[in-house]
């Protein structure tokens, strides 16, 4: 893929820097806790390069290398792993050049505590934006972005400063070992009312806009057996959401906050309790969409025009679940209502997801 998309003319003289024809691939990342999307879903992006170690040397550059058991697996996948947390941007650029890094892949973009100045200073002849920042960096020094035809269609290429490297079907990377455990959860674990219809969203609260929450409230008012199951985030967010429910005349006991699960496999297993997962907009589910689908639960999404609003749609398309993709607030609310009104459709969707998910390209890196 790299050979197909050559570096700019100004940089061609410096690439490749190694006479041994080994390509050095710098993975520039910040290692978070074991809940981190990158840690949990991208092991095999690195692991599968072991089949090409005569062509690639994989170097991990971390801005925060606090270790736990989850990270140990990731670190072990690299040929070299270097903690640069206490180094300056100039020192990191110097290190990269000293390591003869030919390709640097940025996994953070402009997200919190990123070090994008490193890429502005040109730490490698080829620099690629992947996964961490779902959109253009608008930087002349970021050469490429990895995407698919859903997240960046032909008409949108003009909006990107980067050249587009298209992956087939979906650009999302996954981990075949990230699967639900065999642990059984039931309504009693969360004190859900018997025969309730569980609507789930485990996105961070900052993604829940007033427009989306208003639609969820409309659904709760329309279907009396529905409850809303959210992930645990900040206390102020829970208070604000509860306040909004009360304003609309909805009993706060229909809002349930998930307990923290230490094992990701158990977290995925409990998602199976949900009847339907609801997406946010305009910043939709990314790693959480993967979690819903690998757990076998359908997700209704609202597809927008930005990269960040189309990641869920990309994954749903890879599973041929086009009917779960909506294009307006009205369509979104109507689709949720339609499925709740026809529980047999939800059952059929769950069966189809379970039957086809491991055959799809999404779950086959």
Where are these regions (language model features)?
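Conserved donor-binding/catalytic core segment of Leloir-type glycosyltransferases
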Residues: 5-7, 193-209, 213
């Amino acid at each position: 893929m790299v050979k197909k998309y050559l570096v700019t003319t100004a940089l061609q003289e410096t690439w490749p820097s190694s006479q041994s024809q080994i390509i050095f691939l710098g993975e520039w990342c910040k290692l978070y806790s074991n809940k981190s999307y990158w840690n949990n879903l991208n092991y095999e992006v690195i692991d599968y390069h072991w089949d090409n170690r005569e062509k690639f040397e994989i170097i991990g550059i971390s801005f925060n290398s606090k270790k736990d058991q989850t990270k140990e697996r990731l670190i072990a996948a690299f040929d070299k792993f270097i903690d640069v947390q206490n180094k300056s941007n100039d020192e990191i650029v110097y290190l990269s050049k000293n390591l003869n890094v030919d390709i640097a892949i940025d996994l953070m973009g402009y997200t919190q505590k990123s070090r994008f100045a490193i890429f502005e200073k040109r730490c490698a002849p080829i620099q690629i934006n992947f996964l961490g920042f779902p959109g253009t960096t608008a930087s002349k020094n970021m050469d490429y972005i990895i995407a698919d035809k859903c997240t960046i269609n032909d008409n949108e290429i003009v909006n990107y400063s980067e050249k587009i490297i298209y992956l087939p079907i979906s650009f999302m990377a996954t981990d075949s070992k990230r699967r639900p455990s065999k642990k059984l959860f039931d309504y009693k674990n969360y004190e859900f009312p018997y025969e309730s219809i569980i609507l789930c969203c485990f996105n961070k609260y900052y993604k829940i806009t007033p427009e989306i929450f208003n639609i969820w409230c409309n659904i709760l008012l329309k279907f009396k057996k529905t409850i809303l199951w959210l992930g645990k985030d900040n206390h102020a967010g829970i208070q604000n959401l509860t306040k909004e429910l009360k304003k609309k005349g909805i009993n706060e006991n229909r809002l349930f906050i998930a307990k923290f699960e230490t094992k990701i496999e158990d977290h995925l297993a409990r998602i199976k309790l949900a009847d339907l997962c609801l997406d946010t907009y305009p910043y939709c589910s990314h790693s959480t969409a993967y979690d819903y689908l690998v757990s076998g639960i359908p997700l209704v999404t609202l597809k927008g025009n930005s990269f960040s609003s189309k990641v869920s749609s990309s994954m749903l398309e890879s599973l041929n679940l086009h009917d779960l993709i909506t294009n307006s607030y009205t369509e979104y609310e109507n689709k949720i209502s339609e499925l709740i009104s026809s529980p047999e459709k939800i059952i059929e969707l769950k069966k189809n997801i379970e039957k086809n998910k491991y055959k799809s390209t999404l779950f086959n890196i």
